[in-house]
C-alpha cells in the first residue's frame, strides 16, 4: 500500500490498519501418555501435558504467555468385555498463582478465583467421572455417564465458564 494511511474502499476513504505480532514468544512443553493392559479386559491409560510460555513485553522484559495452560491431564481405568464397557476416569488441571498469570490476565478478577491477598488465580481442580456402555447389536449402543461425581466447582483455564455440577447423561445411538 506504499505506506498510505487511507485507501478507497467501495467509494469510501478507509483507514489502513494492521494487527501485527511485534514481540517474540517462546513456547515449550512436554506431553506424555501411558497405556497398561492388566488383562484382556482391563486397561489403564493416562496422559499429561505440561506447557510453559514466555512472551517479550514492549519494554523488553518477559512475562507469562497468555495461552500457555497449566499442567493438565486425564487418567482412565477401562473394563471392556464383549458388549459391556465401563470407563472410570479423572480429568485434572494444575494451578496458576497470580504471579503465574499473564499480565493481561492479572486484572481479570471476574474470570478467576480470588486468593487470600485479593488477587485472581486459577485454582487446580479435578473431576471424577464414570461412563458405561452396552452394545445391544452392531447398530444399537446405549451409554450412561455420570460426570463430576464429586460435584466439584471448576473452571477450565481462561475460559470464563464454570463447569456444570454433577451431570447424568443417557444416550441411545442407532447406526444405519
Features from the language model and the residues they span:
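C-terminal beta-signal and adjacent terminal beta-strands/loops
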Residues: 1, 92-113, 121-125, 129-176
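Surface-exposed loop/turn segments flanking beta-strands in extracellular/periplasmic regions
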Residues: 2-20, 107-114
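Gram-negative outer-membrane beta-barrel transporters
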Residues: 9-102, 138, 150
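Outer-membrane beta-barrel transmembrane domain signature of Gram-negative proteins
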Residues: 19, 118-121
